[in-house]
């Protein structure tokens, strides 16, 4: 049934209109059945019925009337936003559970990611549903006016917290690469949580002016019945402080981190190359074989080579982590940049730009920015095995990793250990045999040298005696 939306119209007038419409319909059906209706009668009836059943909103500017109109239409955009809300809440809950329950993920970077997931989850709980409600009501505020400033405050708070967390992660990893000893000494769980508290404090401080001024003056948060920031100064300052400045810091430190990792990898490879050359270089004459072998063994057993391998492994892990974080950074920038750029354009070219087009773009771009909160858990799932296995177990309601029974562990490990021990014993026997051979060769060489020297001295003494006898 269509809606007669005329302001200040009583229920009786609406009822009378509907009764008149039914009466006209009945008369027309009787005339049509009796064959007396012609084309002109049908046309007159159609025009009259359309005039009565059209949504006549002349003078109807109240939000309640307009909201009823929009609720009658199918709104596919609201359905899409509902899907985004569900993905955001569910995915970030899985991230929070994974960092809380998995010991492998309990480090400084993942604590930041857990706090970021909390911000995204709260965005999905408190901000996105209200935004979907405004879509259903034609982008007009359907709730009490005092809640508008609170809703904008939460929106700015959680969005600012997201970019601040990414900026803090980038800074923390850069400091860890530049000063690893200092960072490992002073980097603990308490320090990580203190940094997270600092990030939230900065985010609250940036977004706090919205409820302070918005609750006092509705014109700062309302514009033509829509709940949005109407203060141009706050739009400009807030966009730069909460997005563009942290974005610049994040991008610069991220590229510096990549450059430092590449430099360390090059130095580590060159260091391993010099160690290999030293191991193959001979300092002694060829006759002294045992000393050379002992020197080579001491080089190969040098713990520095193990340290070099461990350093290469740590650099490789850092590069993999930077790759995942780089994807998260890139997606966040790509999804939020259109909104903030359009937001600044709306303030700069206020008179020359079409406000309707700018408003429509902002309504679309803000949901693209919200989508980044749902994408992060998918990135972790695709590029991190620990997150992927944890998510799959949590979906199956298995919150602890299944451990193998002790008997199965013994069956699998004891033969391997026995094989390794036998190999070690065989290697030790071979080494002892080779050492015995080399020592025998050395002893024989020494004996030959002694015999040769004795023979030479004997010959010399015989020559002297012959000379004496001749004299």
UniProtKB/Swiss-Prot annotation:
The chain crosses the membrane at residues 81-97, 112-137, 147-171, 192-215, 233-258, 323-348, 357-382. GO terms for cellular component: axon; caveola; cytoplasmic vesicle; dendrite; G protein-coupled serotonin receptor complex; plasma membrane; presynapse. GO terms for molecular function: 1-(4-iodo-2,5-dimethoxyphenyl)propan-2-amine binding; G protein-coupled serotonin receptor activity; Gq/11-coupled serotonin receptor activity; identical protein binding; neurotransmitter receptor activity; protein tyrosine kinase activator activity; serotonin binding; serotonin receptor activity. The modification Phosphoserine is found at residue 280. Residues 1-80, 138-146, 216-232, 349-356 are extracellular. A motif (NPxxY motif) lies at residues 376-380. A motif (PDZ-binding) lies at residues 469-471. Disulfide bonds join 148-227, 349-353. Keywords: Behavior, Cell membrane, Cell projection, Cytoplasmic vesicle, Disulfide bond, G-protein coupled receptor, Glycoprotein, Membrane, Phosphoprotein, Receptor, Synapse, Transducer, Transmembrane, Transmembrane helix. Serotonin binds at residues 155, 343. It comes from the Eukaryota. InterPro entries: 5HT2A_rcpt, 5HT_rcpt, GPCR_Rhodpsn, GPCR_Rhodpsn_7TM. Residues 98-111, 172-191, 259-322, 383-471 are cytoplasmic. GO terms for biological process: chemical synaptic transmission; G protein-coupled receptor signaling pathway, coupled to cyclic nucleotide second messenger; glycolytic process; intracellular calcium ion homeostasis; phospholipase C-activating serotonin receptor signaling pathway; positive regulation of ERK1 and ERK2 cascade; positive regulation of fat cell differentiation; positive regulation of glycolytic process. It is a multi-pass membrane protein. A motif (DRY motif) lies at residues 172-174. Glycans are attached at residues 8, 38, 44, 51, 54. Its main location: membrane. G-protein coupled receptor for 5-hydroxytryptamine (serotonin). Also functions as a receptor for various drugs and psychoactive substances, including mescaline, psilocybin, 1-(2,5-dimethoxy-4-iodophenyl)-2-aminopropane (DOI) and lysergic acid diethylamide (LSD). Ligand binding causes a conformation change that triggers signaling via guanine nucleotide-binding proteins (G proteins) and modulates the activity of downstream effectors. Belongs to the G-protein coupled receptor 1 family. The PDZ domain-binding motif is involved in the interaction with PATJ, CASK, APBA1, DLG1 and DLG4. This is 5-hydroxytryptamine receptor 2A. The gene is HTR2A.
